[in-house]
Amino acid sequence: MGKKSRVKTQKSGTGATATVSPKEILNLTSELLQKCSSPAPGPGKEWEEYVQIRTLVEKIRKKQKGLSVTFDGKREDYFPDLMKWASENGASVEGFEMVNFKEEGFGLRATRDIKAEELFLWVPRKLLMTVESAKNSVLGPLYSQDRILQAMGNIALAFHLLCERANPNSFWQPYIQTLPSEYDTPLYFEEDEVRYLQSTQAIHDVFSQYKNTARQYAYFYKVIQTHPHANKLPLKDSFTYEDYRWAVSSVMTRQNQIPTEDGSRVTLALIPLWDMCNHTNGLITTGYNLEDDRCECVALQDFRAGEQIYIFYGTRSNAEFVIHSGFFFDNNSHDRVKIKLGVSKSDRLYAMKAEVLARAGIPTSSVFALHFTEPPISAQLLAFLRVFCMTEEELKEHLLGDSAIDRIFTLGNSEFPVSWDNEVKLWTFLEDRASLLLKTYKTTIEEDKSVLKNQDLSVRAKMAIKLRLGEKEILEKAVKSAAVNREFYRQQMEEKAPLPKYEEGNLGLLESSVGDSRLPLVLRNLEEEAGVQDALNIREAISKAQATENGLVNGENSVPNGTRSENENLNQEESKRAVEDAKGSSSDNTAEVKE
């Protein structure tokens, strides 16, 4: 999915070319685990911590060079085997072929005309690698004992993939051999390539992803070397950081949620063939047919013979695409930038604002988003800003009296301002906030555009620069949009225009104002929205999984094109104790904003 690359050549079962003592690596991984489990660094210290962790990781990688289980040849050499295996096991293989599209990497090309909404691809459950198949594999005994594997389906899936890759007779070998040998996620970035992301809003997630992955590797290296149920794993003698990074990235870029066989809950899966489709703007057209027990995909649009077949991965930002899928999508209509906002507890009106926000179902501090499209803010952010800028009298009106509930109900609707003065204040605040964020970048929009003209830039460097450029363009648009709104409402105030009042008869108007809420209302924390540290963050071991991404599904038992971690309904305290060595300290406290 997305741009793929295969730099190394790898063959199942090749032996190690280097010798290194497990004890030596155990000492290094213990040091790494300690470093990754330390409290979150203070402001401005994240880069320093990242470099320190990276130095340890690179030291481990250097000592493990040549120890990974590998495949010979190029991934495309194995495409015929994949198609044969898929056909023999009930998947559709007619009407498309796998082709290298250069810029986008490998994808599916139509070999006949395919009509919009035509079912063209289906993959039965038996071909999927799932958490359930992991439980029933050689990984089963360790899975039954390790609370991390039980709590985090994505990690279980990553180890399932590694164990099956190391087994030449694995049922899934025809699929695994066609996976990329490496990816373009930030886990594979050189330090200089990551440096391009300094000062961006996305850099915090990049640091978190790298730290979490390093911590997980260090934790599981010890488990594999010391746990009695790990003795029979094919990873016992060779579990390298390179292996884990590859497995994590394979899952991160490909995992999806499907219903379990009885349809009672969701589980994570890798879906052969389907995961070859590249992304474009549109709607989710993939679902899971429980009756036939298979994943099904209908065409997003008409595709003529010879054209690439695209699917829609979901309403993801480019930060999410880069960090979790390893590609940047130009003209992303769902692009957005995170903005952390909170009501300061030192605010004289904090208690009243907190109560109004609570009644509206909005936290006093959270991570919101500024959007690429108009309007730049969601209904929830609009509601937050209105409350944030309210006077004491306006707060009382939303807490007391017969009309208080109606006022709460319309907080997120742009058609019903609290007051003209309140609108002027909130748009002024947003304009100032976005302007301040723009000033934190070390380069300008013009400078980024100039740098992108350099033909010598690596693919990953170009992605990083495009990402920071995209953030700035969204912030700049937000500044301009806020300025226009500020002036509009200032004029309304000066002209003493009458305020629109909500009445029950306005319900149609309220329902028609969907533009304010057509995108995710809030990013509740820095990792929830990001697909797979979404995938691979230990803290998510004790959080409730969501069955769909961004609420976009294609039918009752749909597969969203993008997932969160599996919910195993663990007791929170039990899980917390079980994962103490591996979990990270919370780093997503939002900054308070003082009025």
Curated annotation (Swiss-Prot):
GO terms for molecular function: actin binding; histone H3K36 methyltransferase activity; histone H3K4 methyltransferase activity; protein-L-histidine N-tele-methyltransferase activity; RNA polymerase II-specific DNA-binding transcription factor binding; transcription coactivator activity. Its EC number is 2.1.1.85. Residues 10-20, 549-572, 584-595 have a biased composition (Polar residues). Residues 94-314 form the SET domain. Residues 573-583 have a biased composition (Basic and acidic residues). It catalyses: L-histidyl-[protein] + S-adenosyl-L-methionine = N(tele)-methyl-L-histidyl-[protein] + S-adenosyl-L-homocysteine + H(+). CDD domains: SET_SETD3 (cd19176). Its main location: cytoplasm. Interacts with MYOD1. This is Actin-histidine N-methyltransferase. The lineage of its organism: Eukaryota, Metazoa, Chordata, Craniata, Vertebrata. The gene is SETD3.
